[in-house]
């Protein structure tokens, strides 16, 4: 309370700004963005090695799960020292993917990753949701405990999340009737679009993220991350 009182007295003692000629949309001076040079990802994965997920069995067919094939390509790329994982143009159905250190998952123009609508396609593990550490389904794309990893390209990650929102609103109606409004946020497990957790030097750039079933992009316990 002493700190708060001191802060109030200090703020009240400050001279008032002259706002005689103030106009909305204008600021008296340009903000200092020099701090931005010291944040964000400091390095990108090496692009000299290219691994095609199609060569591991990924199929441009929105009715066939390509999760395992894409993950095998990511793992192989990581084991070889890192590089870029690519996909031929088309629509790919996938569950949870885990991008590893030194790997760039490239979602190129003409490529659409379509998220599986079955929640069982997303393994559960301990994470943090709305301030509480708890077990929760993986995101569609996950970067967990990694360094120098990225997702890039001009393609699309379509999370098709309506099924999870329908579930949430139905449960919320039931919970509100019982006076349990806030609990539904934790009881109704949904799939995030992208999760970056306990990682460093991560870059997410240029692709389109749409129709997520829960949060679009969560950056948790991580540093030097760029979302562009």
Label each PLM-derived region with a short phrase.
Residues 1-5:
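Sec-dependent signal peptide recognition
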Residues 7, 11-104, 108-198, 205, ...:
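Extracellular "leader-to-stem" segments immediately downstream of a signal peptide or signal-anchor
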Residues 220-228:
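Surface-exposed extracellular loop regions of Gram-negative outer-membrane beta-barrel proteins
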